[in-house]
Curated annotation (Swiss-Prot):
<comment type="subunit">
    <text>V-ATPase is a heteromultimeric enzyme composed of a peripheral catalytic V1 complex (components A to H) attached to an integral membrane V0 proton pore complex (components: a, c, c', c'', d, e, f and VOA1). The decameric c-ring forms the proton-conducting pore, and is composed of eight proteolipid subunits c, one subunit c' and one subunit c''.</text>
</comment>
<dbReference type="GO" id="GO:0046961">
    <property type="term" value="F:proton-transporting ATPase activity, rotational mechanism"/>
</dbReference>
<keyword id="KW-0406">Ion transport</keyword>
<dbReference type="GO" id="GO:0000324">
    <property type="term" value="C:fungal-type vacuole"/>
</dbReference>
<comment type="function">
    <text>Proton-conducting pore forming subunit of the V0 complex of vacuolar(H+)-ATPase (V-ATPase), a multisubunit enzyme composed of a peripheral complex (V1) that hydrolyzes ATP and a membrane integral complex (V0) that translocates protons. V-ATPase is responsible for acidifying and maintaining the pH of intracellular compartments.</text>
</comment>
<feature type="topological domain" description="Cytoplasmic">
    <location>
        <begin position="35"/>
        <end position="59"/>
    </location>
</feature>
<keyword id="KW-0375">Hydrogen ion transport</keyword>
<comment type="similarity">
    <text>Belongs to the V-ATPase proteolipid subunit family.</text>
</comment>
<feature type="transmembrane region" description="Helical">
    <location>
        <begin position="14"/>
        <end position="34"/>
    </location>
</feature>
<keyword id="KW-0812">Transmembrane</keyword>
<feature type="transmembrane region" description="Helical">
    <location>
        <begin position="102"/>
        <end position="122"/>
    </location>
</feature>
<feature type="site" description="Essential for proton translocation">
    <location>
        <position position="148"/>
    </location>
</feature>
<dbReference type="GO" id="GO:0016020">
    <property type="term" value="C:membrane"/>
</dbReference>
<feature type="topological domain" description="Lumenal">
    <location>
        <begin position="1"/>
        <end position="13"/>
    </location>
</feature>
<keyword id="KW-0813">Transport</keyword>
<keyword id="KW-1133">Transmembrane helix</keyword>
<feature type="topological domain" description="Lumenal">
    <location>
        <begin position="162"/>
        <end position="167"/>
    </location>
</feature>
Length: 167
């Protein structure tokens, strides 16, 4: 009887809810960052396209980089979801795993939000400046890469945390 009580204290019934909150945090914040980056840089591309339609293909780089942010969040959400199981399946899901998965989701989600914000602003102003001065392109791409790396840092931390939750 004491064994069952100790097990339920370490693995309460609400522990999977916290893990699912990690999935939601990863997808909500990561997708919001990707959407902001896509929308903001898309506005700049639309402005450039009216004056210089020949530059549109080169100016799509910020939009592609914003989409990658959502892929980072999707990868972490799928990894967290693989550790969850339905009640009664005999799978042990502890409170530690729940909080670890919440930390995974928040780390990739919030860094994805920051990266998307960075990519959106740099993409918008960068493509507008590129229309006027072609030498700005290399600098714009470098700044976009540094913005993308913010999301990659969150992905790396989330992957490390996820492996720690497996014991």
């Amino acid at each position: 009887m004491a064994e069952i009580m100790a097990d339920s204290e370490l693995a309460p019934k609400f522990a999977p809810f916290i893990g699912m909150a990690g999935i939601a945090a990863a997808m909500i914040f990561g997708s919001a960052g990707a959407a902001y980056g896509t929308a903001k840089s898309g506005i700049g591309i639309a402005g450039v396209g009216t004056f210089r339609p020949d530059l549109i293909m080169k100016c799509l780089i910020p939009v592609v980089m914003s989409g990658i942010i959502a892929v980072y969040a999707l990868v972490v959400a799928v990894l967290i979801a693989q550790d969850l199981g339905p009640p009664g399946s005999g799978q042990h899901y502890s409170l530690f795993n729940g909080f670890m998965h919440l930390a995974c989701g928040l780390s990739v989600g919030l860094t994805g939000l920051a990266a998307g914000y960075c990519i959106g602003i740099v993409g918008d102003k960068g493509v507008r400046s590129f229309m006027l001065q072609s030498r700005i392109f290399v600098g714009m791409v470098l700044i976009l890469i540094f913005g993308e790396v913010l999301g990659l840092y969150g992905l790396i931390v989330a992957l490390i945390l996820n492996t720690k939750s497996k014991g």
